[in-house]
Regions:
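Conserved donor-binding/catalytic core segment of Leloir-type glycosyltransferases
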Residues: 7-8, 174, 182-200, 205-210, ...
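Glycosyltransferase donor-sugar binding loop
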Residues: 42-48, 193, 206, 221-233, ...
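Donor nucleotide-sugar binding/catalytic pocket of nucleotide-sugar-dependent glycosyltransferases
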Residues: 137-179
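Nucleotide-activated donor-binding/catalytic signature segment of Leloir-type glycosyltransferases, i.e.
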Residues: 233-250
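Aromatic "clamp/platform" in nucleotide-sugar-dependent glycosyltransferases that forms part
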Residues: 270
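Short hydrophobic beta-strand element within catalytic cores of glycosyltransferases
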Residues: 287-290
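Conserved acidic donor-binding segment of nucleotide-sugar-dependent glycosyltransferases
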Residues: 302, 306-313, 322-327
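A short, well-ordered alpha-helix in the C-terminal region of glycosyltransferases
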Residues: 329-342
Length: 362
C-alpha cells in the first residue's frame, strides 16, 4: 500500500503553545512509529511575535495578511509536487480564519480532502452571534471536507448548525513515552504554565492566592511559568511574603519537570479549547484546578480534577485551599488512568488516519 501523503497547516515552536506543541509531538510520533505508512510535510503558521510582546490590532491584521499570502504560496508549491491524500488544517479562530478561507477554497476547487481541526472553544458563541468572525467560520465549515471538534459541546454545536454529517469528536492526545515518570513525591508547589496574560485568569489567580490566610499558604509556593511582560506583572505589586514566583518561559521539557514536582496545576482561563497543559498534568498524576471552559469539564469529569467557574475568585481560592489542606492524590491517580484509556497518542492518531483516508470529496 502506498504511503499516505499528508500536508499539515499548523504552527511549530517556537514560540511554545498548545497547538505548536501538539504539531511537534505528532510529527515526532509519525516519524518514529508511522514512517512506513505516512509521508508528511508541515506549513508552519506560527506568529513571528508573541502575544506578550504587545501585538496591537494593526500588527495582527498585517501579520494575518502576511500569513495568508505565505501559507497560500507554500501550499501551491506543495500541491505542484502532486496532490496529497489530505491537508490537515488547525485553526484557533480570529484573524486566522481569513487564511483558513483561502486554503479551504483552494482545496475545494481542486477536490482535495481536507480536515479542519478546530482548536478553540468559542464556536457556539460565534455561530450564534453571526458577526464577521462567525460568518467566516461558517463559510469555512461549509468548505471543509471533514471537521474535527475537540470537545463534546463544539461537536454538539456543529451538529445543530447542520455540519453533523462531516463532523467528528476527536480529543487531543499525548505521547506518554515522551513524558517523565510520574513523581510519587510532590512538593508544596502549585504551578501555572501558559501565556501570562489577562485572558488566562492571571489576575484572578494572584488575587485568590493573596486572599488565602498566611497560616495555610506560608509553606506553599505559586509558580507562574510562561512568557510575560514586566509591565503586566508589575501591576500585581507582588511582595516576597506572597510566595509567588514569575518564572518566565522555559523549554518544554523543563516546564514538564516543574509540573511533575508540583502538587497541583492551575489554569483559570477565560477560554480554552482542549489544553495540552491540562493533559500533561493529568498524565503526570498532578492534580488539576481549571476553569469550566472548552473541553476542560469533560477532561476532568469522573473525579479527575477540580473545575471552577471562570473569573470566579472565590471558587478558585476554595480550590487552592483544598489542595493545600486535604489529601488530593486521588485526583491525579484517576486522571492518569483516564489519559491512558482515552487520550494516548496511538489511539487518537488512528482516528486521524481514518479521516485522512477519506476521499469522497464533493
Amino acid at each position: 500500500m502506498d504511503k499516505l501523503k499528508i500536508i499539515f497547516i499548523a504552527p511549530l515552536p517556537p514560540p511554545y503553545g498548545g497547538i505548536a506543541n501538539w504539531m511537534a509531538m505528532l510529527s515526532r510520533y509519525i516519524s518514529k512509529e508511522k514512517a512506513s505508512k505516512i509521508a508528511y510535510s508541515i506549513i508552519d503558521t506560527s506568529p513571528k511575535k508573541r502575544v506578550t510582546e504587545g501585538r496591537g490590532l494593526l500588527q495582527r491584521v498585517v501579520g494575518g495578511f502576511v500569513s495568508l499570502i505565505k501559507t497560500s504560496f507554500e501550499l501551491r508549491n506543495e500541491l505542484g509536487r502532486g496532490n496529497p491524500d489530505c491537508v490537515h488544517i488547525t485553526t484557533s479562530g480570529s484573524l486566522g480564519l481569513m487564511r483558513d478561507r483561502a486554503v479551504l477554497r483552494m482545496l475545494s476547487k481542486r477536490k482535495i480532502n481536507s480536515v479542519y481541526h478546530i482548536r478553540f472553544g468559542r464556536v457556539n458563541k460565534l455561530l450564534k452571534l453571526n458577526n464577521w468572525e462567525g460568518k467566516l467560520l461558517s463559510y469555512n465549515l461549509k468548505l471543509a471536507a471533514n471537521i474535527i471538534a475537540i470537545d463534546g459541546d463544539t461537536y454538539k454545536c456543529l451538529t445543530e448548525f447542520g455540519f453533523g454529517d462531516k463532523s467528528y469528536y476527536v480529543p487531543n492526545c499525548i505521547n506518554l513515552k515522551e513524558l517523565p515518570e510520574s513523581s510519587i513525591i510532590k512538593e508544596k508547589i502549585i504551578s501555572f504554565i501558559g501565556w501570562v496574560i489577562p485572558a488566562k485568569g492571571i489576575g484572578e489567580l494572584v488575587q485568590a492566592w493573596k486572599e488565602i490566610s498566611v497560616e495555610i499558604s506560608k509553606e506553599w509556593k505559586l509558580e507562574i511559568i510562561g512568557p510575560y511582560s514586566k509591565e503586566y506583572i508589575d501591576t500585581f505589586k507582588i511582595q516576597n511574603s506572597d510566595n509567588i514566583s514569575f518564572v518566565g518561559e522555559l523549554e518544554h521539557n523543563k516546564a514538564l519537570e516543574h509540573l511533575n514536582m508540583s502538587s497541583a496545576f492551575v489554569l483559570p482561563s477565560y477560554t480554552e479549547g482542549f489544553p495540552n497543559s491540562v493533559l500533561e498534568a493529568m498524565a503526570l498524576g498532578t492534580t488539576v484546578i481549571a476553569s469550566d471552559v472548552g473541553a476542560i469539564p469533560q477532561m476532568l469529569s469522573d473525579g479527575c480534577g477540580i473545575v471552577v467557574k471562570a473569573k470566579n475568585v472565590v471558587e478558585l481560592k476554595d480550590a487552592l485551599v483544598k489542595v493545600m489542606t486535604e489529601n488530593i492524590s486521588g485526583f491525579g491517580n484517576r486522571a492518569l488512568e483516564k489519559v491512558k484509556s482515552e487520550y494516548e497518542i496511538s489511539k487518537v492518531v488512528e482516528q486521524y488516519i481514518r479521516l485522512w483516508r477519506k476521499n469522497d470529496v464533493i
